[in-house]
């Protein structure tokens, strides 16, 4: 019998062993190899003593997965899921089970990374291309981006695009119709203030009275009215203004497209295409414009190109517009951008097809007609005379009606005194039934109303409803492409999703060692609560007493993150890391303004910074001054002192990353903070590398004032192929009054009236349970050990590879932090083999390439994370060593520079079936089975290397021609 205690047998710490890849014996082997006695010894060798944390985190002890699930269930059950008719951009929807099970809950979809390596991402690239096609068809415009963060931030991007492309160069006014959703107006105003734009809000017809560079309209408007703005748009465009429209995706199935009215930019939320409300997110936004504005489009664009065989292949197009290349000159700071949710929306459109979508839209509209007919028959007045799914009602005792509604677990939209005082709104959706409409009659009119839904339906059919004016009824065909007309049975849809999934490499196949990306385990237990209705079906603008579970979760998570970061407060609003940067910089900006120092607008940024840093600083209205790095990759202290002194009067802040983007703990980080503070500035510490800090040090103790946290990196939210993400910011007490507020939801904080950075008050709230579970399950012991094993794995890989590749930077005791950079430039010079060749060759070995040419061109940055086992690390090391041997054959002349496994990588099944392969100087086995490990678990790229130049010169961002399907 065992001699273990009951406490040991209860295995409260079992999840720690599930999350961390190397077992204890493997850890010791690795420690022995790198020359450390223990994880604590390794920590002391790597982390500077001056910043080391000498206490346990106050997050509680680890618990079992069963205990964690029980805790989160108690929290979820405190949410009261009412039937919400609030609308305002958030609606009930049915998530098709085939999509929920095979996409939303499938690690093959949610653990992939942004498709920078398109040869191993053709599946999700096709799904995103479908999303672009849906967006273009419904809006009637030429070119769509892949996805944006939400409708409100898309509106801000539309304003920025309008300023870039408008020919009214002297105009500085952006007009917003006063019937646009208030949260959208809020976010646009916040962005406009940073840019120095003048915002005018008024009735839509007033737009022509101003000299504008752009204008924004809502279609349908917040009260439900549908307006034909064709003449207004023409008048505005004659004055050189750019017309932007926020549109409802479901309504566009039935309504005349904004593009046909003359709109230049159309955007909106794709949430009601099968993505739960989730208390605000995550949801993908669509963004479509005219072809002539393609170079000014924000965010990713998926385009069609060809591979080396001339076959059709997909890729991210025109990347030179984006932050990772153009930095502060980029069109936007967009990086992570809700790709998983865009994929869900695109699959929703594929599954239902044009006819299925029309039935859904017509059902919503018919039920709205019935509701309107019944209420007006009983003497109530409607504010709007036209509608798709929303009516605004005047008359009756609104307070009493609302009280009856709440008693029946129904949420109505109660308009404020400034907006149709004494009225209430009702927005119906895909989940609304005839029973729901009958219940609404009971609540609004009393149970003796005598109305019958079926009878009202007959009346409407006979009367031929005019709630959508004939001139606004859509007459053109949508979604005619074969993709949207062939996968309508669940069997066919399941197979289509699987076929696309099989083209992609995700964490469910192998390690993804992207430096600065932290592709760690997204544990199933952490993910499961996201699917629960108690989290998914909550409207973000519901009364807060219905969201006690969310409130508790957010408060507990905020308290844990405050302790982990050493800050004093958290703000959960930002929907991505880049959005968090913007939010943090706004807090700094507003802090300076409050002190009468609004002139402080210079942001110092090291030349090694991630591209989002300068792009975000530019969005916050700051001027960027770049500081140099020394030969060791650290911030050049002399240059920093000089630059800080030169701009002292106008210094706003510095943006640094810690550990540095070069993968080392800089010894001078606290001195950097002191220098900035001495010159009146604030310190923004980018949280991209927080996975090397948790439990070992904190940004607050280092001396920083604000950081964003990538919850989709350090704290286990999956990357989703390019989103969702969360970028909450932690701040010191003096910045807490200046974090983002919200125009609709005001929980009673000092920051309530500040401008918003996202549409929802808590951003993508429905994925916060993942991070809550991650911290709850690991506890203080597991969080610290995870960080230590991340350091161990990185140093193990670094030391193993150092015998074959130069390691560019190391820190104290010749160690790296959680990632390492190998320098390929000497090999390129000696052999002609490029970093791109090595990246593509890794695909043949079944691996996603590490981060390429960042922060230094001609390098690979490797971050293995703590979740990878020694077996997987050794498999990756074996692949890299084998590739080095292949390079040696090119160096020696055995293989030609332009005809070898690296130059021709990746290899497909078509390659090895081609008789012409016999003419190559290497064998089929060398091409596709270079090691025994590859043979045991082969991943087959479905296209050869893609021609980027061809794709940009022949830009095509819609589905393939019908001939490809014949």
From Swiss-Prot:
Q: Which CDD domains match?
A: GDC-P
Task: Give the record's keywords alphabetically.
Answer: Oxidoreductase, Pyridoxal phosphate
Example GO molecular function term?
glycine dehydrogenase (decarboxylating) activity
Principal EC category: oxidoreductase
Give the catalysed reaction(s), semicolon-separated.
N(6)-[(R)-lipoyl]-L-lysyl-[glycine-cleavage complex H protein] + glycine + H(+) = N(6)-[(R)-S(8)-aminomethyldihydrolipoyl]-L-lysyl-[glycine-cleavage complex H protein] + CO2
Residue numbers bearing the N6-(pyridoxal phosphate)lysine modification? 713
Q: Which cofactor does it need?
A: pyridoxal 5'-phosphate
Report the EC number(s), separated by commas if there are several.
1.4.4.2
Superkingdom to which the source organism belongs: Bacteria
Pfam families of this UniProt entry? GcvP2_C, GDC-P
One GO CC term of this entry?
A: cytosol
For the biological process aspect of GO, one term held by this record is: glycine decarboxylation via glycine cleavage system
NCBIfam families membership: gcvP (TIGR00461)
Do you know which PANTHER family this protein is assigned to? GLYCINE DEHYDROGENASE (DECARBOXYLATING), GLYCINE DEHYDROGENASE, DECARBOXYLATING
Provide the assembly information: The glycine cleavage system is composed of four proteins: P, T, L and H.
Describe the family membership recorded for this protein in Swiss-Prot or TrEMBL: Belongs to the GcvP family.
What is the name of this protein? Glycine dehydrogenase (decarboxylating)
- Origin organism is Shewanella halifaxensis (strain HAW-EB4)
